[in-house]
């Protein structure tokens, strides 16, 4: 039995290695430009269509089961917008062409070899490949989400009762992202130096309002070695001290919201923390759009005139944005740790950008638990500084806990500007000095 298993595993590795060597520029072009021959079409679905509980059955093939249920229950209606081509940054595409042929999976989950920068596995996934889901996960992990570095400043969260729509709490954050390695567009490339801890990426955030949690901060450092655990520290403003987060705390509610730290960006964890299964490719409606054509609000009175996304539907929990037909990879992730609080996530990955505009979470009894939506604005329709950046801009999120009937929403002001990112922000020492 051991010999058979070993032979099968060896065959898988040979297949993976061969597929990596077979990557061509045509594969890369097809991956980044899947709509060269035109956008996908589905009978009856055109810009301006409103999908309601009265007609949702007609369009069920382009929606996930959770969204179909929400529409049937009268929680939300979806308006279809014009399709847009979200071509990513040319530096990221060039890095893919230069390096993808050298990339292969390692022997263990979470191991990758030969990767430098760009999209790790641009070839089309196959249901016959038992590790296709893992490859898709790496494409997300090494995606161009926020580029080499960016800020969300400010970032407004609201905690809402889904039954009444009452806003229970508002928090004003500032988020900062920095890729220490695998950089493709902004110097230093391909890696920040010095980088003695061999970090891949870091996230730093602080709370600006309300006063009772002002100066609360979170720092997450992710290693280039996916088998090493993330380092995470929390500074609570009222305690005025930094404490390291234990592994299990990244799956606790973050500051009383409906999100775990692991939920950030659709999934904020290691590849090795999950088993990944590719379930197929579909044409689906995703919240990807021209932000200049959405219903926006000036409620925060930004000095530059920037307007934010609005919300509608049950409890005001759904981003009020248009959806467009997209090529989607369906990937399931289930925790390696049997004590993890979730049973599985179903990710609907946008095939062009490898962002996660839609993720559905099930509990350990396989019951529908959480609904994640994150609206993606085309950069050329967003802030002037984002135009031409080739970054699909996170613009509006809604995380609904459908079991407790509660949600958290987030309105972004995402800025692709390396001058806003300071290396010193991504250290414990900075957290202490900022909190004083």
Walk through the language-model features, giving the residues of each.
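Short, surface-exposed coil-to-beta transition loops
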Residues: 214-216, 228-229, 340-345, 357, ...
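Extended beta-strand-rich segments in extracellular/periplasmic secretory proteins, especially
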Residues: 163-165, 170-196, 200, 205-209, ...
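Non-transmembrane domains of secretory- and envelope-associated proteins
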Residues: 23-124, 239, 250-318, 325-327, ...
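A short, surface-exposed beta-strand/turn
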Residues: 221-226, 344-358
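Solvent-exposed N-terminal domain segments of exported/luminal and surface proteins
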Residues: 23-230, 236
């Amino acid at each position: 039995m051991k010999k058979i298993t070993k032979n099968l595993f060896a065959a898988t590795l040979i297949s993976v290695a061969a597929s990596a060597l077979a990557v061509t520029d045509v594969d890369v072009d097809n991956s980044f430009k899947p709509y060269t021959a035109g956008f996908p079409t589905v009978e009856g679905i055109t810009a301006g269509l409103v999908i309601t509980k009265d007609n949702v059955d007609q369009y069920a093939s382009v929606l996930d089961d959770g969204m179909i249920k929400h529409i049937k229950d009268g929680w939300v209606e979806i308006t279809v917008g014009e399709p847009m081509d979200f071509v990513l940054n040319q530096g990221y595409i060039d890095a893919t062409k230069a390096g993808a042929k050298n990339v292969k999976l390692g022997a263990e989950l979470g191991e990758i070899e030969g990767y430098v920068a760009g999209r790790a596995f641009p070839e089309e996934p196959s249901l016959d490949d038992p590790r296709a889901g893992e490859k898709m996960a790496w494409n997300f992990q090494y995606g161009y989400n926020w580029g080499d570095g960016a800020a969300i400043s400010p970032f407004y969260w609201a905690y809402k009762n889904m039954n009444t729509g009452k806003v229970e709490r508002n928090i004003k954050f500032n988020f900062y992202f920095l890729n220490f390695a695998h950089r493709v567009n902004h110097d230093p490339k391909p890696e920040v130096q010095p980088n003695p801890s061999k970090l891949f990426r870091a996230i730093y955030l602080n709370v600006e309002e309300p006063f009772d949690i002002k100066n609360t901060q979170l720092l997450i450092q992710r290693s280039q070695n996916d088998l090493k655990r993330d380092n995470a520290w929390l500074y609570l403003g009222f305690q005025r001290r930094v404490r390291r987060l234990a592994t299990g705390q990244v799956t606790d509610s973050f500051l009383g919201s409906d999100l775990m730290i692991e939920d950030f960006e659709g999934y904020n964890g290691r590849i090795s923390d999950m088993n990944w299964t590719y379930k197929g490719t579909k044409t689906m409606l995703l919240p990807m759009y021209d932000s200049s054509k959405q219903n926006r609000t000036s409620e925060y009175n930004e000095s530059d005139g920037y307007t934010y996304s609005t919300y509608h539907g049950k409890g005001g929990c759904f981003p009020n944005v248009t959806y467009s037909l997209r090529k989607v990879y369906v990937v399931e992730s289930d925790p390696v740790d049997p004590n993890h609080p979730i049973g599985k996530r179903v990710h609907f990955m946008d095939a062009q950008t490898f962002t996660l505009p839609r993720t559905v979470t099930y509990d350990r009894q396989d019951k529908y638990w959480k609904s994640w939506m994150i609206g993606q604005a085309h950069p050329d329709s967003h802030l002037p500084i984002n135009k031409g950046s080739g970054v699909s801009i996170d613009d509006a999120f809604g995380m609904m806990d459908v079991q407790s009937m509660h949600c958290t929403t987030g309105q972004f002001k995402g800025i692709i500007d390396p001058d806003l990112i300071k290396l010193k922000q991504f250290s414990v020492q900075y957290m202490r000095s900022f909190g004083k």
